[in-house]
C-alpha cells in the first residue's frame, strides 16, 4: 500500500484488521508526496516482487495542470501492468467514505465539502489522529455490507466520464477480497 496521508494510512490499516485482508501497510509509504515520489515507491515495490496499490487524492489536478499531467502519465504508464493499481479519488478519499452511505456522483469542490456531507452519516468523523487511530470508524464503514455497496457505487461511477466526483478505491478492495478468497 502506497498512500498520501494519515487518513489513507489509518483507513487501510484498520480495513486490514476489520475485513481480514492481507497486505503490507507500512507507515513510511504513507506521507504527503508527489506523483513522482509515488512512482519511485511503486518501482521499489515492483522490484521487490510485490503488487503496488497506490491511493491518492486527485483534487490537486483540478487547478494544477502540471500535477494533472503527472497523474495522467502515471496512470498511463502503469495501465497495462496488473501489478499496479492506481486508486485515485476526486476530490479525496473522503468521497470513497461517503459512497458507503450515499449513491452520489455529485461534484464536490474539496475534501472539506465532502467531509461536511460525510459527517451527516458518520457524525464523529474528523481528520485528526485521535479519531483516525481508532478502528471503530472503519468498522462502521464496513458494517451492514456498506463496503460492498461503496464498491458497487464507485464501479458504476467509474463507467462515467471523470468530470464528476469519483473513487477508484474499489479496485483495491476487489484485489484484497480476491486474495482473501484464494487463500481459503
PLM region spans:
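Catalytic nucleophile-elbow at a beta strand-turn-alpha helix junction centered on a G-D-S/GDSL motif
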Residues: 1-9
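Generic enzyme active-site microenvironment
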Residues: 2, 55-57
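C-terminal accessory helical subdomains adjacent to catalytic cores in phosphodiester-
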Residues: 9-29, 39-51, 58-184
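Short, charge-patterned binding micro-sites
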Residues: 33-37
